[in-house]
Amino acid sequence: NTVCTLRAEENCVFYIAYALYEGVGETLHIRFDPNAPLGPMHEVHGEGTFQREVFIMLGDKTPASRLLCGYTFGPDSGWTSWPPHEHAAMLEETYCYFDMPAPKMGYQITYLEENGLYSDAVAHPVRSGNMVVFPCGYHPTVASPGTRNTYLWALVALRPEDRVYGIYNKDKNYI
């Protein structure tokens, strides 16, 4: 067991992501740097209205049992998690939205697809302070006009060998 004390010197939000610990890795604190150069921790994904910046704070090269996490900053009025994807066979994902105060918002869409048929489609408005958990299904998200989707994402591997960043199944209707 590790004891950790966090102290804020100004108004802030702490995000604490965790997963089952199986003896791999150590407790660590990683300070977010929005000016990090492009490289292993700062990538650009997608193109056009779904291009976004991804900051990988705890990637698969850092020793850990099951956790991966980072931040996504989408374009103004654009899509993130596009094309739609899912990774339920290996990973469960959570999004924690921030820097989207009311009236700004996005829409988190989730749905299942089987044999080319969609089911259980749901769209939820999301903004700062909202958290969405995806145990299964495709989960694209879009920002309303004048808004950027910004969220912390945490992926938890169902098995230690599934702890790999970038493994997902794209919805074949969008390939």
Report the location of each language-model feature.
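Jelly-roll (double-stranded beta-helix
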Residues: 1-175
